[in-house]
Design a protein with these regions (language model features):
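Donor-binding/catalytic cores of nucleotide-activated saccharide
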Residues: 2-112, 119-132
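C-terminal subregions of glycosyltransferases and related glycan-biosynthesis enzymes
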Residues: 122-194
Length: 194
């Protein structure tokens, strides 16, 4: 995000791990600071304790359990992996971290987690977390519809069950966040009915 920052050694630490461990992705830890009070919180702190995970089944399991970072920032991803799997952001689609991370987790075979803080997230009243409009609701609906396509196209029953659970959790979370941010019954109902 443009109002956040990476630590001076963020990229060098991630590159060193990626090259040493031969992984497709490295995720760093996040320090969250409330801008008005300078208070530090653990809003985006890594919850996973493993240093390296290999195998898509285990990676996807951890992702749908919520133990894998969802924000798109603070990740170093192998460019060839992104191109091979056509993992691109959709122009004009807002807040697609969940979509990008979900689609990455569907195919990711190796990841390392760096417990060092490599990203500083500044939480303030102008943060997207606190400011949502109808376009944001529309984008979340679009993202849920893309998840639904992955669900419909999935061949394996166990993974299909996991995708459905992820869709339900995603919808619950976005409805809750939208209510907290807007307290607009009409927009909330619009999102709920979609």
């Amino acid at each position: 995000d443009s109002d956040d920052e990476i630590t001076p050694d963020c990229i060098s630490k991630m590159v060193e791990i990626a090259e040493r461990e031969h992984v497709q992705m490295v995720c760093g830890n996040v320090k969250t600071i409330k801008l008005d009070t300078r208070e530090e919180t653990d809003a985006f702190k890594l919850v996973i304790t493993e240093k390296k995970i290999e195998g898509n089944k285990q990676i996807f399991d951890l992702f749908v359990q919520g133990k894998f970072p969802v924000p798109s920032w603070n990740k170093l991803i192998l460019l060839d992996f992104l191109k091979k799997n056509q993992l691109y952001f959709t122009p004009g689609l807002f807040a697609q971290d969940s979509l990008q991370s979900f689609e990455t987790a569907l195919v990711l075979e190796s990841v390392c987690f760096l417990q060092d803080y490599t990203y500083i997230y500044y939480l303030h009243q102008d943060s997207v977390i606190h400011n949502r409009k109808k376009k944001h609701f529309d984008n979340w609906i679009t993202i849920a519809q893309i998840f639904e396509k992955h669900y419909q196209n999935e061949k394996y029953p166990e993974r299909k069950k996991q995708i459905l659970a992820y869709i339900i959790d995603y919808k619950d979370l976005t409805l809750l966040m939208n209510w907290k941010a807007q307290k607009n019954e009409q927009l909330w109902k619009y999102s709920y009915d979609a």
